From Swiss-Prot:
The gene is ZNF215. Keywords: DNA-binding, Metal-binding, Nucleus, Repeat, Transcription, Transcription regulation, Zinc, Zinc-finger. May be involved in transcriptional regulation. This is Zinc finger protein 215. One of its GO terms (cellular component) is nucleus. Residues 48-126 form the SCAN box domain. It comes from Homo sapiens (Human). Belongs to the krueppel C2H2-type zinc-finger protein family. It is found in: Nucleus. A zinc finger (C2H2-type) spans 379-401, 407-429, 462-484, 490-512.
Length: 517
């Protein structure tokens, strides 16, 4: 019979029968060794996480998988420094944490208990703190942790008879009760409330997306149109079984009331719950949520780009969410276009309607207006991360990374990555041909470094045949050639003196004027 310490040191473990396991445990229960509290370090916790989340698919076979599991277990339990009692303490501590409610487990982990006894003391302190002064919400932390379990039990009985609203999952505190709570419990309360609220919000959207519509109505101020086509039952968010499945947070609901569903991004502000609590007939402490300056459903919403106004009467407009139109009620104003758009959009549907507010604009025009802002720079290069507002700009940009040069010069065979560069290059050839005149006296053949014609042309296209000096204008070349020919076409009428430049003649004539004065 081998003791537990020797079993830990075996490099290649073997499977023990149930009888052998019982004998080993019975033999090891006789130890009388003093032990110290187990303190889990960061490395120990990391090893435990690796051991618990080890995946078989990452190894080549069962032997390697068993070997790695054995190694990770040794790194976690550390049998070379921990006693047998400390190892069992680690296992019991882990299991104890696993059976606690999620919120309580999170709070206990933040306190970093050394052993299971310390953990029990922490939980008892929370219970005693909530029981002080006959608080009406006994064990509120545990009650908050069991909210989801209660909702699970209600969902197992079948489809709910009444729609589930935010009031059904809220835990209320008075101002006096809130002042008596510890800061850690307050943070826990705030996080649980926001989590439940987000669950309701997300499941509401999923239910709308999975619901088939026989007819959808779009209403404007004067007209009404009925949708002709049915939305396919299978959407990209195929959530047909949402009523019978458990969400990632353990909340099961089938539908929500319109009054219980906020706008798509309303929950981003934590004080939204406090300001809208009357809708659910609940009482929340004001101190529980940080005040922020955000829009309510009753406030106007303006397009930040050009102040165009949209009045969306449906807070659950899936089509609006997809294209980026803010799904909240309001009548914002458009100062730039002086055009108002009002429509009622209850879900995704074919766009059939026109609206008469000065101009006849279709629903697609309204959506395209906002989409022009929300989808700006929506085409991103996967190599450098640069974004563009048009797909053609992205394609032209990607040529830089690929090195492709699809534009070829028919004169010299040189390639360019942009059409504009080819056009500029071809202009050099055209000007070079014009430079083979008698004024320049030098012709450029294709054989003279045709791959780089700018060496010949550059910015100076006109070259003097006498001294080789180049000029970028023909008039400058003509004026320069007068130096070599000695020609002086500008003659003074006073003294008959001739000059090769008109500027020199003007200066000379000023001398005559000064002498006369």
């Amino acid at each position: 019979m081998q003791p537990l310490s020797k079993l830990m040191a075996i490099s290649k473990p073997r499977n023990l029968s149930l009888r052998e396991q019982r004998e080993v445990l019975r033999a090891d229960m006789s130890w009388q060794q003093e032990t110290n509290p187990v303190v889990e370090t960061h490395d120990s916790e990391a090893s435990r996480q690796k051991f618990r989340h080890f995946q078989y698919l990452k190894v080549s076979g069962p032997h390697e998988a068993l070997s790695q599991l054995w190694e990770l277990c040794l790194q976690w339990l550390r049998p070379e420094i921990h006693t047998k009692k400390q190892i069992i303490e680690l296992l019991v501590l882990e299991q104890f944490l696993a059976i606690l409610p999620e919120e309580v487990r999170t709070w206990v982990n933040l306190q970093h208990p050394n052993n299971s006894k310390d953990m029990v003391t922490l939980i008892e302190d929370v219970i005693e703190m909530l029981e002080d002064e006959d608080m009406p919400c006994k064990d509120s932390a545990l009650q908050m942790g069991s909210i989801k379990e209660k909702m699970k039990a209600g969902s197992r009985t079948g489809k709910p008879q009444e729609p589930v609203t935010f009031k059904d999952v809220v835990v209320e505190f008075s101002k006096e009760e809130w002042g008596q709570l510890d800061s850690a419990v307050k943070n826990l309360y705030r996080n649980v409330m926001l989590e439940n609220f987000r669950n309701l919000n997300s499941l509401r959207k999923a239910h709308l997306l999975s619901k088939p519509f026989e007819s959808l109505k779009l209403e404007s101020k004067k007209k009404r149109w009925i949708m002709e086509k049915e939305i396919p039952r299978k959407t990209i968010f195929d959530m047909k079984s949402i009523s019978g499945e458990e969400s990632s947070h353990g909340v099961i609901m089938t539908r929500l009331t319109e009054s219980g569903h906020p706008s798509s991004d309303a929950w981003k502000g934590e004080n939204w719950l406090y300001r809208n609590q009357k809708k659910w007939d609940i009482n929340l402490p004001q101190e529980a949520f940080i005040p922020e300056t955000i829009y309510t459903e009753e406030e106007d919403f303006e397009c930040s780009e050009n102040k165009k106004s949209f009045d969306i009467n449906s807070v659950s407009s899936i089509c609006a969410i997809q294209v980026g139109i803010p799904s909240r009620k309001g009548s914002p104003k458009c100062d730039k276009f002086k055009t108002y758009f009002k429509f009622n959009l209850d879900s995704v549907g074919k766009q059939h309607s026109e609206y008469e507010y000065g101009n006849d604009l279709s629903l697609s025009t309204d959506i395209r207006h906002q989409k022009s802002h929300t989808t700006m720079n929506s085409y991103e290069c996967y190599q450098c991360g640069k974004a563009f507002c048009r797909s053609s700009s992205l394609i032209r940009h990607q040529i830089i990374h690929t090195g492709e040069k699809p534009y070829k010069c028919s004169e010299c065979g040189r390639f360019f990555n942009r059409r504009t560069n080819l056009t500029k290059h071809q202009k050099l050839h055209a000007e070079a041909k014009a430079c083979t005149s008698n004024k320049c006296g030098k012709a450029f053949s294709k054989s003279e470094d045709s791959n780089n014609p700018t060496l010949h042309f550059g910015n100076n296209f006109y070259q003097c045949v006498n001294c080789g000096k180049s000029f970028n204008r023909s008039s400058s070349l003509i004026r320069h050639q007068m130096i070599h020919t000695g020609e002086k076409p500008f003659k003074c009428k006073e003294c008959s003196k001739a000059f090769n430049r008109s500027s020199n003649l003007v200066k000379h004539q000023k001398l005559h004027t000064r002498d006369k004065s």
